[in-house]
């Protein structure tokens, strides 16, 4: 099965293929129905990139016979091994029309898109109803600079500096992030404070009668005027002094638009672009790391509001976050 979508600079085509170990060799045969999506001038090699950031280069050739077929050669076994594929996983290949394939995996048991694997080969999947996606989260919270955050040095403003910023041991303290970002925050009586959650979560504000507040609808319309494309997903954020320097992508935005993220992403403001790393936790929560440099260079105040517009490809892969700061 293959489908077509649109990139901002052209068209993209996609095909789906189940992984069957008994039929899998060192080559990957493309579906015959996908032949019409290939360019007349075939590339000698193609680049395959998984959603977790792994990249492979494979040969690309045409096979003769009664029916013309096209094959990715010399490297498919490595992809199977690197991504720890299981029989029945559904594979998605999105072609940019030239020589590049974005590669996604849908788990055979949950049918959820796999985001990233840990070093122990565990599968991290965003699931509707997971702990990360509870609407009681304080999803309007963003972090501020923390001097302990080694991914957020003062030598910012350049892509190169952000590329080398890492924790001392090369690992990320996921437990600390969860605790400080409020996912398991509880009162002294051991119960979650629902009033605080409602106050912090401004996405689905409702009156007592269960209807959306008209003022909230007007605010949403007012915020969309700052977007380059009113159809793009977006969210609003304000600073929270209790957070580390990471920008949390609200789970409901990811779920509603079926968004996926690469290993690194571009953050754009009026001063230019910064390249930042994406962090995907085991529970599926997604963060932009090293966001303190963005806060510093814009000299943001606690009363300022950020409108974050997510720009994506035809396959809903987010490549850029454009941030508009509204002075408070």
Swiss-Prot record:
A GO term, aspect molecular function: protein heterodimerization activity
Biological process, per Gene Ontology: synergid death
KW Nucleus (keyword) present: yes
Entry superkingdom: Eukaryota
UniProt KW keywords: DNA-binding, Nucleus, Transcription, Transcription regulation
Gene Ontology CC terms: nucleus
Subcellular location: Nucleus
UniProt cross-references to SUPFAM superfamilies, sorted A to Z: DNA-binding pseudobarrel domain (SSF101936)
InterPro entries: B3_DNA-bd, DNA-bd_pseudobarrel_sf, Plant_B3_domain
Disordered: region residues: 145-221
Protein species of origin: Arabidopsis thaliana (Mouse-ear cress)
SMART domains, per database record: B3
Main location group: nucleus
Annotated transmembrane regions: none
A Pfam family reported for this protein in Swiss-Prot or TrEMBL: B3
Protein name: B3 domain-containing protein At5g60140
Record carries keyword Oxidoreductase: no
Record field: compositional bias (Acidic residues): 148-182, 190-221
Residue ranges of the annotated DNA-binding region, renumbered to this chain: 13-109
């Amino acid at each position: 099965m293959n489908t077509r979508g649109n990139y901002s600079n052209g068209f993209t085509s996609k095909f789906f293929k189940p992984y069957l170990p008994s039929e899998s060799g060192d080559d990957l045969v493309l579906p015959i129905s996908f032949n019409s999506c290939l360019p007349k001038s075939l590339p000698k090699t193609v680049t395959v990139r998984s959603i977790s950031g792994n990249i492979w280069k494979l040969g690309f050739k045409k096979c003769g016979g009664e029916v013309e077929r096209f094959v990715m050669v010399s490297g498919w076994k490595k992809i199977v091994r690197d991504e720890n594929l299981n029989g029945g996983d559904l594979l998605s290949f999105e072609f940019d029309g030239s020589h590049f394939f974005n590669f996604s995996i849908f788990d055979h048991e949950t049918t959820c898109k796999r985001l990233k694997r840990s070093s122990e080969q565990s599968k991290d999947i965003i699931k509707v109803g997971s702990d990360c996606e509870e609407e009681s989260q304080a999803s309007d919270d963003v972090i501020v600079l923390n001097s302990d955050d080694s991914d957020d040095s003062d030598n910012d403003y350049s892509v190169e500096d952000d590329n080398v910023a890492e924790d001392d041991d090369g690992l990320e303290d996921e437990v600390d992030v969860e605790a400080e970002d409020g996912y398991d925050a509880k009162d002294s009586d051991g119960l979650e404070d629902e009033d605080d959650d409602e106050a912090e979560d401004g996405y689905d504000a409702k009156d007592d009668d269960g209807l959306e507040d008209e003022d909230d609808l007007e605010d949403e319309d007012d915020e969309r005027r700052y977007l380059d494309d009113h159809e793009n997903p977006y969210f609003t954020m304000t600073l929270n002094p209790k957070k580390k320097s990471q920008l949390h992508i609200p789970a409901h935005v990811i779920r509603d638009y079926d968004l996926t993220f690469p290993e690194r992403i571009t953050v754009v403001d009026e001063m230019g672009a910064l390249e930042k790393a994406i962090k995907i936790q085991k529970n599926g929560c997604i963060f932009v790391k090293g966001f303190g440099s963005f806060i510093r260079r814009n000299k943001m105040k606690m009363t300022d509001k950020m409108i974050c517009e997510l720009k994506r490809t035809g396959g809903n892969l987010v490549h850029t976050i454009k941030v508009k700061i509204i002075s408070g």
